[in-house]
A protein has these predicted regions:
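Specific transmembrane alpha-helical segments of multi-pass solute transporters/efflux pumps
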Residues: 18, 22-23, 51-101, 137, ...
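Helix-helix packing/entry segments at the starts of transmembrane helices
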Residues: 39-41, 82, 97-103, 169-192, ...
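Hydrophobic transmembrane alpha-helices of multi-pass small-molecule transport proteins
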Residues: 50, 120-142, 251, 260, ...
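Juxtamembrane helix-entry segments on the extracytoplasmic side of multipass membrane proteins
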Residues: 4-9, 31-36, 40, 62-68, ...
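Transmembrane alpha-helical segments that form core, pore/gating elements
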Residues: 50, 108-110, 114, 128, ...
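Glycine-/small-residue-enriched transmembrane alpha-helix faces in small-molecule transporters
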Residues: 1-40, 87, 145-172, 193, ...
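Specific alpha-helical transmembrane segments that line the substrate/conduction pathway
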Residues: 37-48, 76-77, 85-119, 135, ...
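Hydrophobic/small/kink-forming positions within alpha-helical transmembrane segments
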Residues: 17-20, 24, 51, 75-79, ...
Length: 302
């Protein structure tokens, strides 16, 4: 692993730290907002921040080219993952959704190979499968899966595929534009949809008095961190480390989330969690350090 790849892993790790706040902050946000409002509202917050930053540095607020690729990224990052996950959570509890979502690093690697034409070794796939298996075992062990629903499962699978695809497409765009511009243009392009939907959902809120401090902080952190700032180092990390390899760092996210849950929500960490954490760290390290084949990035026509 060369210096650029090591730097990419560092960026990806920092991004996952920011992404790991999503679940605790979503729990706070849901104290006062519906799942769908949380999904679209955070995109609006991210877009407002993006427009402010672009104005400060005097950059255009829409991409100069590659509109089709930006639309693909937007569909996954702004709509696919947040909305499909919200719809799934309306039908079932969190644990079954978490089990299916655990395969995201693996599906991202598959998309990177199929669409991004990256080459990885057999050791990488073995390490990735082991890490994914530990994640599925860990999340499955935390619930009895009461209320499981096939439609919810299919919605979650769709969310995972949408998110994995947008990760790969966004990483390819960062070979042309800086990562912060990519995510800025993505959330801004979604405004014609997210703004009216968010306004409509706001007027559907029956008890605005239930919007407490936790809900407000949760929404702001989701919009600023999970929907915007986290994607800047994430896309840079996937570009430098390689999408397949860099995405494996996300296997650590569930355990980082548990860490935040201890600090923010006062939850406890059982011994099984620590054991699975060690297994995941070893699997991720193996995947990252595995021999890398030559890669050919997706050629985007200008």
């Amino acid at each position: 692993m060369n210096k650029t790849q090591a730097q990419g892993i560092g960026f990806a790790f920092f991004a996952v730290v920011l992404f790991s706040l999503s679940l605790p902050m979503t729990r706070w946000a849901l104290e006062g907002f519906t799942p769908l409002f949380t999904a679209t509202g955070r995109a609006v917050i991210a877009a407002l921040l993006a427009m402010l930053l672009l104005k400060i540095v005097r950059e255009r607020i829409t991409p100069p080219d590659h509109r089709k690729e930006f639309i693909y990224t937007m569909l996954g990052a702004v709509f696919g993952w947040p909305i499909l996950i919200a719809l799934a959570l309306l039908r079932t509890e969190t644990a079954p959704v978490a089990v299916i979502a655990s395969i995201m690093p693996l599906t991202t690697a598959i998309f990177a190979v199929l669409r991004g034409h990256e080459n990885v070794s057999n050791q990488f796939w073995i390490a990735s499968l082991i890490g994914t298996g530990i994640l599925v075992f860990f999340t499955a062990s935390r619930s009895s899966f009461d209320g499981n629903d096939l439609i919810a499962d299919l919605l979650t699978v769709g969310a995972v595929l949408a998110s994995s695809f947008c990760y790969v497409q966004g990483a390819e765009l960062t070979r042309i534009y800086p990562g912060w511009k990519v995510i800025s243009w993505v959330v801004i392009m979604a405004l014609p949809i997210t703004v009216p939907v968010t306004i409509w959902l706001w007027f559907q809120v029956e008890d605005r008095g239930a919007i407490n401090t936790h809900a407000t902080i949760g929404m702001l952190v989701l919009g600023i961190s999970s929907m915007y700032l986290g994607f800047i180092p994430w896309y840079r990390g996937l570009k430098d480390a390689g999408t397949a390899r860099g995405s494996q760092v996300q296997q650590l996210q569930v355990f980082m989330t548990l860490g935040w849950s201890v600090l923010i929500l006062g939850e406890s960490v059982p011994p099984l969690t620590l054991a699975c954490s060690i297994g995941i760290v070893l699997a991720v390290t193996w995947a990252i350090l595995s021999r890398q084949g030559r890669s050919k990035s997706l050629q985007v026509a200008k």
